[in-house]
Amino acid sequence: MTTGIRVPTLGESVTEATIGKWFKKLGEAVAVDEPLVELETDKVTVEVPSPVMGKLTEIIAKEGDIVEVNAVLGFVESGAAGISQSFSPSATSIPEAPSELEQSPSSSATPSGTMPPAPSAAKLMAENNIAKSDISGSGKRGQILKEDVLGALAQGTKASTSVATLTASSSSAAPIQEMREERVRMTKLRQTIARRLKDAQNTAAMLTTFNEVDMSAVMDLRKRYKDLFEKKHGVKLGFMGFFTKAVCHALKEFPTVNAEIDGTDIVYKNYVNAGIAVGTDKGLVVPVVRDADQMSLAEIEKEISRLGRLARDGKLAVSDMQGGTFTITNGGVYGSLMSTPILNAPQSGILGMHAIKERAMVVGGQIIICPMMYLALSYDHRIVDGQEAVTFLVRVKESLEDPERLVLDL
């Protein structure tokens, strides 16, 4: 029985995908739910599994083809016949070991009675492109010694060999020149990232304001309770949970930063869906922690951990990345000291975290060493005034420098 492999439903507003790659070749056996083909959409990468056990008998859509939802990608022949045929000895060619006469000259023995070059001589010959036939060995049974190679170099063997090498390298210059460039088609995800970032720049009146935060209090709190926190909640206590809580706290006071423009209207969101930017091998994705303002610190950390794992494994669903109202990105994990993050349209704000660096700070009239981080808030100046943006960032700073405020809701 033959079963068709079809493009699954890819989520709201997604109607087509690009064939990324086939994991199986024609004639190969497949198991139930084993990934057959990878589909790339403008939001996620999806693996299509085999619905039955059998053998892949036909591939209709090739790599790079654009296919619509429910389109047939190929066929799998199910049943014992398909499996036994794919594993039968006659279907698999086993290469025979080469006979002694078919072995390459490099593996053949040296002429009878002749010793191979000494290791130091062989190394010197290889470095100077000198063949054994160009040198007469003075060692026992004609072995080439290091002194023989040095003597040949002094007599000009190197020069004649260099001419031959130069001629050979000139003939291969053209292929090498062609290999200096490579043209690769962008993936659907990369095309979407490029388009959305450029749209954000062209549409929003984007501006960035900066501040710095002393991370001493958060780092001390984390150091004291991280083991107990992980033991109780089953997840590590990171910095992102504190930042998410601080953002949710500040957004209550400044709802415009959590709003968006729709035509001539401003849409205020009475909830916080925090987008957490995650870097993957295929590009940046922003999964969403829904109703983060209603979550505890432990719940936020668990959800961030879950979404981050899905993102790195390429298993995020489209729904996992929809509906965000504010984004947090952490360039500090890559060593960034300061940046101007680009808005994730249609959102009106994005917070950029950066690397923590010890710096000399004046505190209470004294110079002390503090672990400092630069914060950057990019915002849409069309609806967020400068005073709101600056004060919003100050509130985030205050919450992080005094994390007890987050617990007491102050």
UniProtKB/Swiss-Prot annotation:
<feature type="domain" description="Peripheral subunit-binding (PSBD)">
    <location>
        <begin position="116"/>
        <end position="153"/>
    </location>
</feature>
<dbReference type="InterPro" id="IPR023213">
    <property type="entry name" value="CAT-like_dom_sf"/>
</dbReference>
<dbReference type="InterPro" id="IPR011053">
    <property type="entry name" value="Single_hybrid_motif"/>
</dbReference>
<dbReference type="GO" id="GO:0004149">
    <property type="term" value="F:dihydrolipoyllysine-residue succinyltransferase activity"/>
</dbReference>
<dbReference type="GO" id="GO:0005829">
    <property type="term" value="C:cytosol"/>
</dbReference>
<dbReference type="InterPro" id="IPR006255">
    <property type="entry name" value="SucB"/>
</dbReference>
<dbReference type="InterPro" id="IPR003016">
    <property type="entry name" value="2-oxoA_DH_lipoyl-BS"/>
</dbReference>
<comment type="similarity">
    <text>Belongs to the 2-oxoacid dehydrogenase family.</text>
</comment>
<dbReference type="InterPro" id="IPR050537">
    <property type="entry name" value="2-oxoacid_dehydrogenase"/>
</dbReference>
<dbReference type="GO" id="GO:0033512">
    <property type="term" value="P:L-lysine catabolic process to acetyl-CoA via saccharopine"/>
</dbReference>
<comment type="pathway">
    <text>Amino-acid degradation; L-lysine degradation via saccharopine pathway; glutaryl-CoA from L-lysine: step 6/6.</text>
</comment>
<dbReference type="Pfam" id="PF02817">
    <property type="entry name" value="E3_binding"/>
</dbReference>
<dbReference type="InterPro" id="IPR004167">
    <property type="entry name" value="PSBD"/>
</dbReference>
<keyword id="KW-0808">Transferase</keyword>
<protein>
    <recommendedName>
        <fullName>Dihydrolipoyllysine-residue succinyltransferase component of 2-oxoglutarate dehydrogenase complex</fullName>
        <ecNumber>2.3.1.61</ecNumber>
    </recommendedName>
</protein>
<dbReference type="Pfam" id="PF00198">
    <property type="entry name" value="2-oxoacid_dh"/>
</dbReference>
<keyword id="KW-0450">Lipoyl</keyword>
<dbReference type="GO" id="GO:0045252">
    <property type="term" value="C:oxoglutarate dehydrogenase complex"/>
</dbReference>
<comment type="subunit">
    <text>Forms a 24-polypeptide structural core with octahedral symmetry. Part of the 2-oxoglutarate dehydrogenase (OGDH) complex composed of E1 (2-oxoglutarate dehydrogenase), E2 (dihydrolipoamide succinyltransferase) and E3 (dihydrolipoamide dehydrogenase); the complex contains multiple copies of the three enzymatic components (E1, E2 and E3).</text>
</comment>
<dbReference type="InterPro" id="IPR036625">
    <property type="entry name" value="E3-bd_dom_sf"/>
</dbReference>
<dbReference type="InterPro" id="IPR001078">
    <property type="entry name" value="2-oxoacid_DH_actylTfrase"/>
</dbReference>
<dbReference type="InterPro" id="IPR000089">
    <property type="entry name" value="Biotin_lipoyl"/>
</dbReference>
<dbReference type="Pfam" id="PF00364">
    <property type="entry name" value="Biotin_lipoyl"/>
</dbReference>
<feature type="active site">
    <location>
        <position position="385"/>
    </location>
</feature>
<dbReference type="GO" id="GO:0006099">
    <property type="term" value="P:tricarboxylic acid cycle"/>
</dbReference>
<feature type="domain" description="Lipoyl-binding">
    <location>
        <begin position="2"/>
        <end position="77"/>
    </location>
</feature>
<keyword id="KW-0012">Acyltransferase</keyword>
<keyword id="KW-0816">Tricarboxylic acid cycle</keyword>
<feature type="compositionally biased region" description="Polar residues">
    <location>
        <begin position="101"/>
        <end position="113"/>
    </location>
</feature>
<feature type="modified residue" description="N6-lipoyllysine">
    <location>
        <position position="43"/>
    </location>
</feature>
<feature type="active site">
    <location>
        <position position="381"/>
    </location>
</feature>
<feature type="region of interest" description="Disordered">
    <location>
        <begin position="86"/>
        <end position="120"/>
    </location>
</feature>
<comment type="function">
    <text>E2 component of the 2-oxoglutarate dehydrogenase (OGDH) complex which catalyzes the second step in the conversion of 2-oxoglutarate to succinyl-CoA and CO(2).</text>
</comment>
